[in-house]
Amino acid sequence: MIKKIFITGILLIVILLFVRPKYKLGMIPENPRLEKIICRQLEKNELTEEDLLNVDHLFVNGKYGRVKTLVGIERLKNLEILSIYPGKMISLEPITNLTKLTAIGIARRNKLTDLQLIGQITTLTDISLRDMPNIDISFLENLRNLNDIYIADCGITNIDCLKNLNPEEVHLWNNNIESLPDLSNWTKIKKLDLSGNPITKNRDIVDENGDVYMSYFKKDLE
């Protein structure tokens, strides 16, 4: 009896590991790989138009589907949060059609080299970029509604494009920032973390942990 139960258990594990669900695709014919990811997230084998409208967050994991583009994502008309980690992504089009998007996160060495389209999504309040070496973040200057900014392990050398924004939290871990621009416009700032950066100028405003003394901003406001 015990042997029979053991064998049955092994068979169930094998089935769970190797039998993949069969998806009935067709709602996003131009990008079936993206549709599969949505099916997996919603735990459904087939999507309806209502399902697409109910998706308010999407996690595009490169381990599933190897999505290279976001073509068809505009069908998710109520999408608010988009995470891409990691993957083969080479293009963000047509991301600018996501009119309700408020947060985006991209990480782990995607093949994306041009993030300028993100600069057109003025509804964004949160952005996270991690492990994206040598990216150009100049597009951030257009995102005046950003409250939280996370940029880590991206090799950026300056944050001049952020000086005219007014964020609440900025985390810039492990980059190559050596100096800071005038940040007197940051009247709402609560946290600025520069740990892991070779700050050479304005060193007097950064403590040993890489945190900027908030008194620096208060002084600018007096």
Label the model's feature ranges.
Residues 53-117, 123-139, 145-157, 161-178, ...:
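Concave beta-strand-loop units of leucine-rich repeat
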